[in-house]
Amino acid sequence: MAGLGFDETELRLGLPGAGELAARSSGKRGFAETIDLKLKLQPAAPAAVSGEEGAQEDKEDADAAAAAADEKMSMKRSASQSSVVTAEPDPDKPRAPKAQVVGWPPVRSFRKNVLAEKCKAAALVKVSMDGAPYLRKIDVAMYKSYPELSMAFQNMFTSFTIGKCGSHQQLKESNKLRDDLEYVPTYEDKDGDWMLVGDVPWEMFVESCKRLRIMKGSEAIGLAPRAVEKCKS
């Protein structure tokens, strides 16, 4: 017992020989262990290489997708251009006649000219009446006789009492106006003279009438003798 040391006779909890393993493990790392550790860490390098290869493959896939998208866009553009070319009208085929447009937006100049020609063809005459705050326009050529024109005056100015236009023969037989007439239709001829409506034949009246005025009977009394004298001459 005297030859045994304190460490050998010390009682400890643990497996037999655990103390020696602890002593060995507490020492410095040996050369062999260091080499083994380096060899175990070397396989990490190929992993990095494989990551670079994956990135390269992803880039190639992205480039291929972009090229496919560009090809689709070029195909769409070519299809749209071909449709525009096919939509062009045939120069040999005659165009359809354009319909006349009335209202807004304003019509074009050539259509205005057509409307102006139609207005010139019609014998439009202004019609005014003493005491009426408005004017009218009528086409004298639309009517066939003086009685029709008289009815048109009655419809234009319904609130006034207008004398009926007699025939040319009736006016020649009477040299004065009736006193009971409130308004009498008169007209201005090409010479600028004011005369009673009905003092000349209807065809001559249509050609010479420039303006119509329905004046009061008291103001038109002096026109009857002059109209009759002009008819006689």
Swiss-Prot record:
Alphabetized InterPro entries for the sequence: AUX/IAA_dom (IPR033389), AUX_IAA (IPR003311), PB1-like (IPR053793)
* Superkingdom of origin organism: Eukaryota
Annotated region Disordered: the residues are 1-27, 46-100
Instruction: Kindly report the protein's main subcellular placement as a broad class.
Output: nucleus
Disulfide bond as a keyword? no
Q: In which tissues is it expressed?
A: Highly expressed in etiolated shoots. Expressed in roots.
Lipoprotein listed as a keyword: no
Q: Which UniProt keywords apply?
A: Auxin signaling pathway, Nucleus, Repressor, Transcription, Transcription regulation
Q: Where is the composition biased (Acidic residues)?
A: 54-63
Q: Where does it reside? A: Nucleus
The induction comment states: Not induced by auxin.
Gene Ontology BP term (one): regulation of DNA-templated transcription
The record places domain PB1 at 122-217
List the GO cellular component terms. Answer: nucleus
Placement of sequence motif EAR-like (transcriptional repression)? 11-15
List the Pfam families hit by this protein, alphabetically.
AUX_IAA (PF02309)
**Known partners and oligomeric status:** Homodimers and heterodimers.
Q: Which family does it belong to?
A: Belongs to the Aux/IAA family.
Protein task:
Aux/IAA proteins are short-lived transcriptional factors that function as repressors of early auxin response genes at low auxin concentrations.
Full protein name: Auxin-responsive protein IAA11
